[in-house]
A protein has these predicted regions:
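Non-catalytic, polymerase-adjacent accessory regions of viral genome-replication enzymes
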Residues: 1-172
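Conserved polymerase palm-domain catalytic core
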Residues: 174-177, 181-196, 200, 224, ...
Length: 418
């Protein structure tokens, strides 16, 4: 993600972010069963968050910080990985060229972290019951600039009909104006533009396209919040997270079902997940970690902005638009409290046999050794989701007998294949 406070004089221990004790219990963190070395990844992220004294993409908007030469003497720029943010071959102008082309060795965008955000990360990691009380000030003009360059340049415009290149024409003035409005409380979120794309089954999936300024601010807020929630999310959570792509989720799933004692599998699908996220519950979950009232008001604005379809505005009482920059983080926070912590506790306290889980966004697979555990967990999952306004899709959620002798056992019982 993008960064802020590239030239902050505040040390990690002197960050303006403060915190107070909360009372939410936290389940134990699970190490993902993949081929990735978690300790090396953690050291890399620490270095990224600690990187300071540099503007976005290693450049300064003044002459104080010199441009980094192309030959970096073998030193790789430190950055936190991002997923699915490709670059276009064209650029708005030569003055914006370098910032949009700086890349890491793995091809992901170069995004240095500020000391302030490093302090947020350390505070959140040190005590997962702390509520952080001062977060909005981390959304600086520099972070907004970085967030702008994280956006897809060819993305369709929202209700403002403004493209990335339109905004780039008067970039500096507009970023400064946007920054001022955010901190004066004058920023207003625009409704999402409703559009539809076809689904594999022939039905249409609704998408919400945010206005360009809303995308910028959402990207900045996501950067700040990821410093908190990446310390909280459990090891079996994948999807729309730094370094946790679908390929790593599949790797973890393969290891889980081949190396563990798995005889039964719940293959689950949540019906209309993003369209049914409860605003009330989501804000309660966010308040477990965020005590900054201004940041909470900002996060609530995007939930209440509504949607515009064919020029007609309608309110949104539940759900968050698929396609919005902030929605994947909202979804992961929601399922962290509704599913992840619950199933992690359930398998430790109630399961008779071994239980393994891999979740990718709103899709998840749970493996069981015991059939009784699988059937009981599925029944309790339905009740758990109903409490928070969610539902397991009755046609797409399956309980599957699995394993080396599964087919033989089904044949003996006269059962049909799954």
């Amino acid at each position: 993600m993008s960064n802020d406070q590239g030239e902050s004089d505040v040390s990690p221990t002197e960050s303006e972010t403060t915190s107070t004790a909360g009372n939410l219990p936290h389940g134990s963190r699970e190490t993902p069963e993949t081929s990735v070395a978690p300790m090396a990844a953690d050291r890399s992220e620490k270095a990224r968050c600690h990187k300071s004294g540099m503007h976005v993409s290693g450049e300064s908007h003044s002459s104080i910080v010199p441009k980094k030469p192309a030959n970096n003497s073998g030193r790789t720029p430190l950055a936190e990985p991002a997923e699915g943010r490709g670059l276009t071959k064209e650029n708005a102008s030569p003055s914006l060229l370098d910032r949009t082309q700086r890349r890491n060795k793995d091809g992901t965008p170069f995004r240095p972290r500020s000391r302030g955000l490093w302090g947020v990360r350390q505070a959140a990691r040190k005590d997962r019951k702390l509520k952080l009380t001062s977060l909005l000030h981390h959304i600086t003009a520099e972070l907004l600039r970085a967030s702008f360059f994280e956006l897809k340049k060819q993305a369709a415009p929202g209700v403002d009909d403004e493209t990335w290149r339109d905004y780039a024409e008067d970039f500096e003035r507009r970023i400064e104006d946007l920054h001022g409005r955010i901190h004066r409380g004058a920023y207003r979120a625009k409704p999402s533009k409703r559009t539809y794309i076809p689904k594999p089954d022939g039905r249409m999936r609704p998408l919400g396209i945010a206005a360009l300024e809303d995308k910028i601010v959402q990207q900045a807020a996501r950067t700040v919040l990821e410093c908190i929630y990446e310390q909280d999310f459990l090891g079996f959570s994948y999807g729309f997270r730094p370094g946790r792509s679908q390929h790593r989720a599949l790797d973890a799933l393969y290891v889980g079902i081949t190396k563990r004692k798995v005889n039964w599998i719940i293959d689950a699908d949540i019906r209309g997940f993003f369209d049914n996220i409860s605003h009330e519950w989501l804000m309660k979950f966010l308040e477990h970690r965020i005590a900054d009232r201004r940041m909470l008001r900002l996060l609530k604005k995007w939930l209440r902005a509504g949607v515009s379809e064919d020029g007609e505005w309608s309110p949104t009482k539940v759900g968050t638009p698929q396609g919005a920059v902030i929605s994947p983080l909202y979804g992961n926070v929601f399922l962290h409290y509704v599913l992840d912590l619950w199933i992690d506790d359930w398998r430790k306290r109630q399961a008779r046999g071994e239980v393994t889980i891999v979740r990718y966004a709103d899709d998840f697979v749970i493996g069981f050794r015991e059939e009784s555990d699988a059937r009981r967990c599925l029944a309790e999952l339905r009740e758990r989701f109903a409490k928070f306004g969610l539902e397991l899709h009755p046609e797409k959620t399956r309980l599957i007998e699995f394993g080396r002798y599964a087919e033989e056992r089904r044949t003996k019982r006269g059962a049909s294949p799954p």
